Amino acid sequence: MSGSKSVSPPGYAAQTAASPAPRGGPEHRAAWGEADSRANGYPHAPGGSTRGSTKRSGGAVTPQQQQRLASRWRGGDDDEDPPLSGDDPLAGGFGFSFRSKSAWQERGGDDGGRGSRRQRRGAAGGGSTRAPPAGGSGSSAAAAAAAGGTEVRPRSVELGLEERRGKGRAAEELEPGTGIVEDGDGSEDGGSSVASGSGTGAVLSLGACCLALLQIFRSKKFPSDKLERLYQRYFFRLNQSSLTMLMAVLVLVCLVMLAFHAARPPLQIAYLAVLAAAVGVILIMAVLCNRAAFHQDHMGLACYALIAVVLAVQVVGLLLPQPRSASEGIWWTVFFIYTIYTLLPVRMRAAVLSGVLLSALHLAISLHTNSQDQFLLKQLVSNVLIFSCTNIVGVCTHYPAEVSQRQAFQETRECIQARLHSQRENQQQERLLLSVLPRHVAMEMKADINAKQEDMMFHKIYIQKHDNVSILFADIEGFTSLASQCTAQELVMTLNELFARFDKLAAENHCLRIKILGDCYYCVSGLPEARADHAHCCVEMGMDMIEAISLVREVTGVNVNMRVGIHSGRVHCGVLGLRKWQFDVWSNDVTLANHMEAGGKAGRIHITKATLNYLNGDYEVEPGCGGDRNAYLKEHSIETFLILSCTQKRKEEKAMIAKMNRQRTNSIGHNPPHWGAERPFYNHLGGNQVSKEMKRMGFEDPKDKNAQESANPEDEVDEFLGRAIDARSIDRLRSEHVRKFLLTFREPDLEKKYSKQVDDRFGAYVACASLVFLFICFVQITIVPHSLFMLSFYLSCFLLLALVVFVSVIYACVKLFPTPLQTLSRKIVRSKKNSTLVGVFTITLVFLSAFVNMFMCNSKNLVGCLAEEHNITVNQVNACHVMESAFNYSLGDEQGFCGSPQPNCNFPEYFTYSVLLSLLACSVFLQISCIGKLVLMLAIEFIYVLIVEVPGVTLFDNADLLVTANAIDFSNNGTSQCPEHATKVALKVVTPIIISVFVLALYLHAQQVESTARLDFLWKLQATEEKEEMEELQAYNRRLLHNILPKDVAAHFLARERRNDELYYQSCECVAVMFASIANFSEFYVELEANNEGVECLRLLNEIIADFDEIISEDRFRQLEKIKTIGSTYMAASGLNDSTYDKAGKTHIKAIADFAMKLMDQMKYINEHSFNNFQMKIGLNIGPVVAGVIGARKPQYDIWGNTVNVASRMDSTGVPDRIQVTTDMYQVLAANTYQLECRGVVKVKGKGEMMTYFLNGGPPLS
């Protein structure tokens, strides 16, 4: 077994309200850092150590590595508890000092180069710790890995112009085989995305770009219908708001159209009726869409009904009004097309079909009603260009917005998924953690990780004192015989099965299992919460254990029995040291309880007088005569008793309690908790059947257990997201976090985070705006007379825009270009200020190209010329005078009239339409704030309206006159009649109105886009923060667990839920085992009021063990694993896994020998500075062991085998201040020139006579 069962008095910190004890330094955080470093495959040495640690085959650790590690794991120093009360032994002249090596220093003397822990930390600057790799503890990677192949992520198709930039987070990396599929084809967008990590480049082939552009025009959806419905629910309220906004602007447009029609008589009833009906229908739909009964399924129906209304308005608006012109109705057609793309929540396919249908209707009706115009071809070509540009801009606006929304939804879902995964894993960690440590200890430790605490002279000691508890020790008598009949693996399985049963009994009897030492099991009742019936609980526990072992005896045929000893009194409980914490209890009463078990009888419960007094006569007893069987009991004159049976009164009470428990269980409506799906003594039964005796012990047949199938993680995420969508209130989020008009966050920190977001599609925005510029150029080249200025200006603008596009798109494939260009591109794209300036510059060039040719047109006033020709006043001129003019003025004549050398621009309304396109280009830049867009669009409107109304007013007046004359000529079919009713609304009146309508609609769209983006950012930020908090808690638990269990063992038990009988063990071929005990510590330990009832003695022991833990954490001892402490005995081993076992060089054996010598030196140092005379005995042995965990639900890692037993005997039979080794150990060390001497033959219990040796020193220095 793994060492002696004797438990020394030293204890655990009693932190009570009446007598709080001071806390030590922050080394427990270093302990967690070490555990996590080892978990990531990197060695760790605490920051305060300069004990000559050697580095792993690679020289010294750099200061940068030290700084990274220090900043990662040392968030701050630990807080100090309130100081000791007036009876502080340090203040009261207690006769010894309690400074460990990490804190002790000579006052004015020479420490031999050793400073205080604080000095060493300052000198080391973080210690010799090797920094872990970027990415930390790996919790995020674990969360990402949990998603596996089932996770659904949208694939980004960035308009075919740039790749998806890596965000540095696994949740944002796009993976092949996942993403958005095209609507209807059910296949994935295989080569449509270009994905790379941050800082990588990608070569975009022409075929890939074309394919990506084709994908843009196709509707996107998630492969999962359930996920797609969740996405629609996610944006339902925002879509409802967009739909309402669209209805409002459509009503406004219809009213403007009605006003224009009313301003040019004669009125047409059909036109008025259709538009009035359209307004009424839209208003009714708006009311219905904002009712509570309106839900997601109604959205599509409302959208398509609205498209039908728009198509009706389009047809009536083009067919009925007079005078007819191919340029009539372009502005509202552009408006309808663009708003369908941007404000109507429909799929891309529906939006494209609607836009094309509206364009085709306008072109067809224009061709039909204006077929006799000689200049119709130019107008139709220009109209095609305008509608094509509008559709493309609509696609370029709709697509990024939808992709952004889908990515925001998916990233939020991924955050929730990672959070739920972390939560599940954290719950598993919590269960595992709380099965090893009581809740109050574990919570205090985790709180200390977070707290920023001051550096203290002493290490933090986690200790509590409990005055009224009962301690039970139980040993299996005859276990040696049972063990001799099975292999080491079968022995571990037997222990696991038996002690799992004892753990269940302990829970039922309100006892807390403390530790398992070999075949010894001890527990305490009254911890952590006090109980008045603690003695009864321990006695009942002892009876159940004896009954359980009797059934084991029946099943196995081996004469095994339980020897139980119980004592009631006071304990100190908690953990000692910095590594591999195990909850334990210490006190003189614990020592007495241990001897009560040793002096007891098989199959009987041996109690002291103190325990008997707590039983209140509920049990019949007889004298125990423990002093006859145990020297300790005899020496201290302990009166003992043996339990005979329960009294009748106690039996009735137990029956009543059992009945109440059954009634309580039945009222809850489920079966009482059972002890898992255990298969105890499976090897002895030879099958899956559970015998009658086993059922009597409480073990259940696996077939009888109702296995609970774990929910699908994907379904759990979707269900959680659905609840969150239903619970969130967009209006509340807006009012609480976002200013109403400016749409900025109320909290400056949120605004700062939002402003730092990088929009990777900026190059696509610039490219789209440049495309608008090209369309404007083609429109004006088609409809406006050519000039040298036009050619030179457009060529200059094209070169400038091409340069801007080139620099912006470099960001998507940086490695293909020189470093200066890469730097310039990053500075533009990654800076919101720079990208906004570049966007404004691009929009300015597009706007200038829309109207600059106006200044090259004939600015003579046609009305004045006609008045002069007909000798009438200007007010008397009308369209009929144009027809009667000798100069034959017409819309198709580009020759300058009135003697002007400049050509006529007879269609100035196309300048206005070009300006409308430039406004659409403004809306493409999604990264520009809505207020910025509003200011920019108002500036464009002001400048253009000013030009129209002042220098260009004659251009528009001339066009109005010519259009009216052309319509009259067309309606009269060449006759000389001139009806006076042929009028139209002046372009100089129409232009400001339609531009204002566009500015309003584009501002509302910009506000909607930004509001959506900010709310998505806010919700994703909240989900991310919750996920990070969960991951932070998970990291705390993981570091704490790795400081309790080896990392591979912890990972095994965290992988999934384990049954109590599931066994974890591994056979190790050649392990070096060390037991190091402070031989005379029991003499030092006393419980006096002056030393806080022994707490200060335990504080010194904690300092000693902490120093040992710091030594074992050094890099040169990375092959060693601390197993546990048993009182004042320190147990360690090396070579327990492939990474620490050196079969050829035996370095793990030499490492444990060096470690043993280092402990001897450290103890001398402690004695020198604490004015004590502690004597250490160390035993070493090598050989095969079995390493494993007993109890899957309450795991305890240990090693077993003959090698462990002999190593323990080397310690117990050793000589103070010497290191005793076996012959096997001697042969390995002697071969490596270690200095040893032969002690001779030593009589070892259970082994007979053995030849042993003393280790005196390491290899001589060469």
Swiss-Prot record:
Signal peptide as annotated in the record: none
Question: What's its top-level EC category?
Answer: lyase
Sorted alphabetically, which Pfam families does this protein's record hold? AC_N, Adcy_cons_dom, Guanylate_cyc
Needed cofactors, names only, are:
Mg(2+); Mn(2+)
Q: How is its activity regulated?
A: Activated by G(s) G alpha protein GNAS. Inhibited by G(i) G alpha protein GNAI1. Activity is further increased by interaction with the G-protein beta and gamma subunit complex formed by GNB1 and GNG2. Activated by forskolin. Is not activated by calmodulin. Inhibited by adenosine and ATP analogs. Inhibited by calcium ions, already at micromolar concentrations. Phosphorylation by RAF1 results in its activation.
Q: Which family does it belong to?
A: Belongs to the adenylyl cyclase class-4/guanylyl cyclase family.
Compositional bias per record (Basic and acidic residues), positions renumbered to this chain: 25-37, 152-172
| GO molecular-function terms, A-Z | adenylate cyclase activity; adenylate cyclase binding; ATP binding; metal ion binding; scaffold protein binding
Please indicate the ranges of residues that lie on the Extracellular side.
858-910
Q: What are the start and end residues of every segment in region (Disordered)?
A: 1-194
* The protein's role, per its UniProt record: Catalyzes the formation of the signaling molecule cAMP in response to G-protein signaling. Mediates signaling downstream of ADRB1. Regulates the increase of free cytosolic Ca(2+) in response to increased blood glucose levels and contributes to the regulation of Ca(2+)-dependent insulin secretion.
Show the PANTHER family listed in the entry: ADENYLATE CYCLASE TYPE 1, ADENYLATE CYCLASE TYPE 5
Residue intervals on the Cytoplasmic side: 1-196, 396-763, 1006-1262
Self-association or partners: how does it assemble?
Interacts with GNAS, GNB1 and GNG2. Part of a complex containing AKAP5, ADCY6, PDE4C and PKD2. Interacts with RAF1.
What residues are glycosylation sites in this protein?
239, 834, 871, 888, 973
Question: Could you confirm whether the keyword Cell membrane appears in this record?
Answer: yes
Transmembrane ranges, per UniProt, are 197-217, 243-263, 269-289, 300-320, 326-346, 375-395, 764-784, 790-810, 837-857, 911-931, 936-956, 985-1005
Where are the Phosphoserine residues found in this chain? 97, 156, 667, 755
- Give UniProt keywords alphabetically: ATP-binding, cAMP biosynthesis, Cell membrane, Cell projection, Cilium, Coiled coil, Glycoprotein, Lyase, Magnesium, Membrane, Metal-binding, Methylation, Nucleotide-binding, Phosphoprotein, Repeat, Transmembrane, Transmembrane helix
Q: What is the protein name given in its UniProt record?
A: Adenylate cyclase type 5
Q: Does the keyword rRNA processing apply?
A: no
A Gene Ontology annotation in the biological process aspect, one of them, is: cAMP biosynthetic process
In the Enzyme Commission scheme, what number(s) does this protein have? 4.6.1.1
Q: Where in the cell is it found?
A: Cell membrane; Cell projection, Cilium
